[in-house]
Amino acid sequence: MIERLNIVKQRFDEVNDLIIQPDVISDQKRYIELNKEYKDLRALMDEREKYISITDNIQEAEEIISDGSDPEMTEMAKLQLDEAKGQLPALEDKIRMMLIPKDPEDGKNIVMEIRAGTGGDEASIFAGDLYRMYTKYVEGRGWSHNIVDFSEGTSGGFKEMIFEVSGDDVYGTMKFEAGVHRVQRVPQTETQGRVHTSAATVMVLPEAEEFDVEIDPKEVRIDYFCSSGPGGQSVNTTYSAVRLTHEPTGLVAQCQDQKSQHKNKEKAFRVLRSRLYEMELAKKMEADAAKRNSMVSSGDRSAKIRTYNYAQSRVTDHRINLTLYDLSNIINGDIQKIIDELQLAENTEKLKENSDTI
């Protein structure tokens, strides 16, 4: 393991030198990429120092025990050896996980889309529940979020909700939420007390930078219309809302959340760029998942990933057969335990895949 860590140390020193070079600082794309790499390598260097300290302690203790000339020192060395050997396995496991090649998308911000599926009004209400669950989780993480576009349901909730989330490692955390979520409960409108099953689809798009996707302005049709969103009468009487249509792919992105037409256009372009980027990413994820037979990150938007059963207070994630009887806390934003298990499952898959090199 130390050989692998020493190779990483060489790269860390190289990156440390590169990020202060004028030609790198002037190249925005390269500078951002190297800064992200520096942050990851810095964390590994901290663990490398711990690893060297523990292995040095083991070697020192073994030498004292082997010498045996001082009984008191030998006893102290035995205690030191036991303590150091006890610390080593957990640290080695942590380092192995950190040595897994990181998905370059994981550090990106996201555009998140929630759409009501089968189930009529109840599906819209459930989509609203999911939006509230995610925003509470996002706020708890100290991330920021803002609405891009939405369409309200006739009896509450949303037929569609599109919002941006910004922070550290947002995509790497939230990407596991993409797929079909099902709810099993008695709707408020149900008089016979029958349980209905409804669904909502969640999409998580890594927010593409301008240098990730180049959009030819000639290929984008721009339409302006009156906003139906919040913001008072002035919003509804001016053509501030913006709809973009990317003609080669047919992809559409619109924003009506801001009073400013310019800001709405800017947001809509971010969403369009992210959707184009995600199209390519989904193909790559599908190919990668097929290669390692992964169910955690398959890139399949139609996959049923999770069921929320209100009668049993049960939440089941079907990808990893995880069942938790804690629905009220989960639907109120406490989804970290689910995300932790999904990240662990994906890292375990990657660890098997990279076992020869780590």
Swiss-Prot record:
Subcellular localization, as worded in the UniProt entry: Cytoplasm
GO CC, any one term: cytoplasm
Membrane spanning stretches: none
Keywords, in A-Z order: Cytoplasm, Methylation, Protein biosynthesis
Single GO MF descriptor: translation release factor activity, codon specific
InterPro entries (alphabetical): PCRF (IPR005139), Pep_chain_release_fac_I (IPR000352), Pep_chain_release_fac_I_sf (IPR045853), Prokaryotic/Mito_RF (IPR050057), RF-1 (IPR004373)
Coiled coil: none
Pfam families attached to this UniProt entry: PCRF, RF-1
Highest taxon, organism lineage: Bacteria
Residue numbers of N5-methylglutamine PTMs: Q233
Post-translational modification: Methylated by PrmC. Methylation increases the termination efficiency of RF1.
Main function: Peptide chain release factor 1 directs the termination of translation in response to the peptide chain termination codons UAG and UAA.
HAMAP family on file: Rel_fac_1 (MF_00093)
Protein name as it appears in the record: Peptide chain release factor 1
Organism the protein comes from: Christiangramia forsetii (strain DSM 17595 / CGMCC 1.15422 / KT0803) (Gramella forsetii)
Lineage per the UniProt record: Bacteria, Pseudomonadati, Bacteroidota, Flavobacteriia, Flavobacteriales
